[in-house]
């Protein structure tokens, strides 16, 4: 009986890994551009409602997210992560409240200049291993307020 050798799966080459990563990023950007089209149609009241609802949703999960962050990163204390999550939800939202981010946001009649807020496009959000959840929360809220889709690159640590 002949020895049947098991074929080991081949590991992807660095070039194949890079191509796969580029394809994934391209797909995410394509989805982000679709979201951008939808975001551009929103008025200030709709944007503010979305930010408020996102903030409340994150606030409702602040402790669960804190526990997950500590479990995944093995860094920090749950209590500290929870506090940072609450800060990101409440204080960032309160700071952004009342700030105009849609349409004409300032008029200078003397110079005859109007400042108009427009989304800058799909943005990248980098998150540190030390504060993954609070960083994702506050960057998400800011991206929502400015009507910019955001793609996160989480630290692999």
Could you describe each region identified by the protein language model?
Residues 2-113:
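N-terminal Rossmann-like NAD(P)+-binding subdomain of aldehyde/semialdehyde dehydrogenases
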Residues 97-157:
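Conserved small-residue-rich beta-alpha loop and adjacent elements
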């Amino acid at each position: 009986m002949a020895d049947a050798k098991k074929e080991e799966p081949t590991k992807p080459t660095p070039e194949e890994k890079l191509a796969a990563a580029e394809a994934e990023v391209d797909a995410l950007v394509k989805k982000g551009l679709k979201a951008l089209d939808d975001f551009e149609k929103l008025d200030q009241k709709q944007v503010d409602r979305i930010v408020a609802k996102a903030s409340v949703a994150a606030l409702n999960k602040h402790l669960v997210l804190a526990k997950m962050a500590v479990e995944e990163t093995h860094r920090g204390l749950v209590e500290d992560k929870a506090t940072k999550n609450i800060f990101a939800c409440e204080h960032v939202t309160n700071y952004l409240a009342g700030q105009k981010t849609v349409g004409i946001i300032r008029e200078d009649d003397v110079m005859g200049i109007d400042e108009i807020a427009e989304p800058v496009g799909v943005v990248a959000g980098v998150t540190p291993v030390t504060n993954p959840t609070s960083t994702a929360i506050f960057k998400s809220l800011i991206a929502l307020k400015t009507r910019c889709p955001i793609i996160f690159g989480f630290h692999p640590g």
